[in-house]
Amino acid sequence: MTQPLVGKQILIVEDEQVFRSLLDSWFSSLGATTVLAADGVDALELLGGFTPDLMICDIAMPRMNGLKLLEHIRNRGDQTPVLVISATENMADIAKALRLGVEDVLLKPVKDLNRLREMVFACLYPSMFNSRVEEEERLFRDWDAMVDNPAAAAKLLQELQPPVQQVISHCRVNYRQLVAADKPGLVLDIAALSENDLAFYCLDVTRAGHNGVLAALLLRALFNGLLQEQLAHQNQRLPELGALLKQVNHLLRQANLPGQFPLLVGYYHRELKNLILVSAGLNATLNTGEHQVQISNGVPLGTLGNAYLNQLSQRCDAWQCQIWGTGGRLRLMLSAE
């Protein structure tokens, strides 16, 4: 019988020696050539000398974890397909891995090798094993499950909140939030676009009933892709966030989510020291040390068919932004390293 993975090179990045050996044996039995790494540091050294067809990667590892490894390779333009196999129970880690472009996430313990085989084949042969129709059907099922279970949707949203302090795109970011402990209020999301720039948004989910939570989950899933698309089509190096918010407003209507969705979106480029902010219905003040600016709050998304927005741009290497609305208050702080 022909071995299906003959000619394929698989990089296995796993700190547990027994599980690493099991994966090595399993892939070898399918004909693949395997290369082994105990953590992200070893993997980066190996990736300097070859490009695998697929990387299998754990999240929790010594010296350099899987998320840091993914950030390194994506920032240098490496789009090697990655399948994460991890024992993590942290939804934020899973969400970050998916945002960094992994093909899929499989949770340990791996009990179904047929499922692993299907996922590996889908990574290596996407045109044969990935169906757009099936992906859309899965998406609709997941969306319907969130609509039918508001408590689960709110719990998921809470688990996806970013850590209160982190270093991202070589910037130190932290925030403080004052909201009711028993319900969602202001939802913050922040993510690196490259090693030099990042984007964030703050959404007040309290003015649209359960649709506020659903809008937050939808926005989290789509935001990075929308902004990357904006940047790809811009001749200049900075995005037009007003156009982005108009696109979000349109998507909320397409998703049949009525209500008001106060939203503030920001973008920061570390090398250019340029901060861009635009608000649709949230109050905010910006302090750069030299200047304090009141941001025009505008009209919440969902109120009108079109969003009419003013974009604020400031040059600074450190700043604080106070944001407030019906859902509470939040202070976001950034300093470039």
Swiss-Prot record:
Q: Which InterPro entries match?
A: Bact_response_regulator (IPR050595), CheY-like_superfamily (IPR011006), PPM-type-like_dom_sf (IPR036457), RssB (IPR028616), Sig_transdc_resp-reg_receiver (IPR001789)
Q: Its induction, per UniProt?
A: Expression is induced during stationary phase by RpoS.
Residues in a coiled coil are none
KO phenotype (gene knockout): Mutants exhibit nearly constitutively high levels of RpoS and are impaired in the post-transcriptional growth phase-related and osmotic regulation of RpoS. In exponentially growing cells, mutants exhibit significantly reduced levels of polyadenylation and increased stability of specific mRNAs.
Molecular function terms, GO-annotated = phosphorelay response regulator activity; sigma factor antagonist activity; transcription cis-regulatory region binding
Report the GO terms under cellular component. cytosol; protein-DNA complex; sigma factor antagonist complex
UniProt modification remark: Phosphorylated. Phosphorylation stimulates the interaction with RpoS and, therefore, the proteolysis of RpoS.
Which Gene Ontology terms describe the biological processes this protein takes part in?
negative regulation of DNA-templated transcription; positive regulation of proteolysis; protein destabilization; regulation of DNA-templated transcription
User: Which residues does the record list as 4-aspartylphosphate (modified residue)?
Assistant: 58
Keyword list (alphabetical) reads:
Phosphoprotein, Stress response
* Activity control mechanisms: Under certain stress conditions, activity is inhibited by the anti-adapter proteins IraP, IraD and IraM. IraP is involved in response to phosphate stavation, IraD in response to DNA damage and IraM in response to magnesium starvation. IraD and IraM interact with inactive RssB, blocking its ability to interact with RpoS. IraP may mimic RpoS in its interaction with RssB and directly competing with RpoS for binding to RssB.
Effect on the protein upon substituting residue 214 to H: Resistant to IraP and IraD
Extract the PANTHER family matched here: CHEY SUBFAMILY, STRESS RESPONSE REGULATOR PROTEIN 1
Q: Which family does it belong to?
A: Belongs to the RssB family.
The record's domain comment reads: Contains an N-terminal receiver domain and a C-terminal output domain that are both required for binding to RpoS. IraP and IraD interact with the N-terminal domain. IraM interacts with the C-terminal domain and, more weakly, the N-terminal domain.
Its assembly, as annotated, is: Binds to RpoS with a stoichiometry of 1:1. Interacts with the anti-adapter proteins IraP, IraD and IraM.
* Function summary: Regulates the turnover of the sigma S factor (RpoS) by promoting its proteolysis in exponentially growing cells. Acts by binding and delivering RpoS to the ClpXP protease. RssB is not co-degraded with RpoS, but is released from the complex and can initiate a new cycle of RpoS recognition and degradation. In stationary phase, could also act as an anti-sigma factor and reduce the ability of RpoS to activate gene expression. Is also involved in the regulation of the mRNA polyadenylation pathway during stationary phase, probably by maintaining the association of PcnB with the degradosome.
HAMAP family, per database record = RssB (MF_00958)
Q: Know the name of this protein?
A: Regulator of RpoS
Q: Which organism is it from?
A: Escherichia coli (strain K12)
This protein's encoding gene: rssB
